Amino acid sequence: MLFAVICTDKPNSLDLRMATRPAHLTYLETVDVKGAGPFLDASGNPNGSLVIIEAADQAEAQAIAGRDPYAMAGLFASIEVRPWKWLIKNPETK
């Protein structure tokens, strides 16, 4: 099942995000990520994340989100994990 992990950074946390980024990217290579990328502020700086993951259920998806180095470093003001259905341009349905 697919889940959207929607994260909002704490204010003034760009330095923490950039310092933690290498570990975050390495971690994402270890889980079943279908797509990911940052949200951007008006200046083009990252201020949140969207990660689409595959997991067996909500509990597993939340555990995956909680083990992300960004989450463990305290970067996020909020983390929302929601079931997601990929309808448009899903490469697995072609």
Q: What kind of region is each of these model predictions?
A:
Residues 1-94:
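Conserved, structured core segments of small domains
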